[in-house]
Amino acid sequence: MNSFPNDDLVYEILLRLPAKSVARCSCVSKLRRSILSRQDFTELFLTKSSARPRLLFGVKRANGEGLFFSSTQPRNSYEKSSLVVAADFHTKFSEVISREICSYASGLIYLSDMRISVNDEDVVRAICNPITGNYLGFDPIDKQFKVLFMAYPSGPDDHKILTLGTRRMRWRKIHCPLTHDPFCEGICINGVLYYLAIQIDEPLVNQRSFVIVCFDVRFEKFTFIDVDCFYHLINYKGKLGGIDWKHGNANGSRTFELSMWVLEDVEKHEWSKYDCTFLEYEVMFYNISLAVGMTATCEIVLSEKFASKSFYVFYFNPERETLQRVEIQGLENHCRVYTITDHVEDLNVNYKRKHKMALVRRFLAAKKIIGGSVAKLRKETSAILYLNRYWSYPASTTLINYKGKVGVINLTHAYERVFPLQLRMTVLEDFEKQEWSTYVYTLMAENIVVKYVSVVGMTATGDIVLVKTNACKPFYVFYFNPGRNTLLSVEIQGVGEDHKCLNFHTVCAFVDHVEDLQFSFKN
């Protein structure tokens, strides 16, 4: 008599577990591994995980080690102004050499210049699932992942693209008509990858203009949009959006002005703009604050760059004009923190052996692989958006998916790098006309002193997520909802310890992370 429960009961039990626990179950027996690798189960798990997206943190230690944590995202950030949550540890990598730890797409992390094992001599580029710790894989047909390699300052035909999941993965050359230098990670909205870049005019090298590069992945074509200065791109209700911010002064009081642009018409390039101003006394920051993204609930998220004793993330709702503070506990102290909003745990990628393959080994090391280089894409055409104004702080700019439109977020902070923060979001309303809308908000957080805050993205619910970029305790994540104009601060516990002698450990955070069970391996 077979005592093993039927598949329906096994599914019901496993669907209640996090992806890491499910991945461990696959090691129990071949029978359970076969059940967990079935497409119907992995799709069910992904659907359930998508309904509960998380905040993903990538922490980079001073010794080069990379760690991944995640925490829950508040569902109703406007109900409370301050929260404290604990972070869950997932996996650790031996050495991440690159300055920027990773880029993110659909539950997968791209890591450049890393050593998978402490005994590895070769430095590789790899794609992994941060929940299971497994590397490299593919989705079924019509759910392809691709890696876009943009070479600079080489010629326009030196760019390459790689499709994951094919039997013979190889780099193919791809033509881009515009010589440009990508300077921030990209965002994928409805099969189009958007990223910010500086256009390089060959006859006049010292002259610069700024563009949003639009890459249609199905047709592998580029188009371009001229835009103003953004600090961060977001997905605002399926539209491309951009966020910018600056500090000001009103009646003798220092203010934080946040602007958000939304691309209302892609063809005409028409944008709408939203502005919001906050008073400085509501938030106190002695650190760099950056908009890191927007949640699926349309909240702009502000985060610190480095983890310290107190790590905060702020959620600002532009519609309600509310600001919520979240203290993140558990991140390591003195670490660089990268924050990603709306992370969805996904186990959708299968490969035969764990830690066996790296995507690229020392491939054109002097050139750039753009942020957002791993994308879940179905179409392959592209366009370019131009940014004509000079961007004083391009590193503070983030692309977002704002309600299905490409958006850009810019975060401005005071000289002392404290709250209030001014967040400017620009959304591409009309792609053809390159018309943008702009929204400006000032973010305030009460009685919180945090350093090194950055925008990591926008959640599927429309919250812009900001996090500390180091893992010093306490660790905070901030959810800003442009619609409500609210900022929620969430303290994440469990990410790190107090290490007085260590240098800053960096943290990378990802929004709307979905656990996926299909990224597993066979022995």
Curated annotation (Swiss-Prot):
Domain of life: Eukaryota
Pfam families found in the cross-reference section: F-box, FBA_3
InterPro entries: F-box-assoc_dom_typ3 (IPR013187), F-box-assoc_interact_dom (IPR017451), F-box-like_dom_sf (IPR036047), F-box_dom (IPR001810)
Domain F-box, first and last residues per copy: 4-44
NCBIfam families (alphabetical): F_box_assoc_1
Name of protein: Putative F-box protein At1g30925
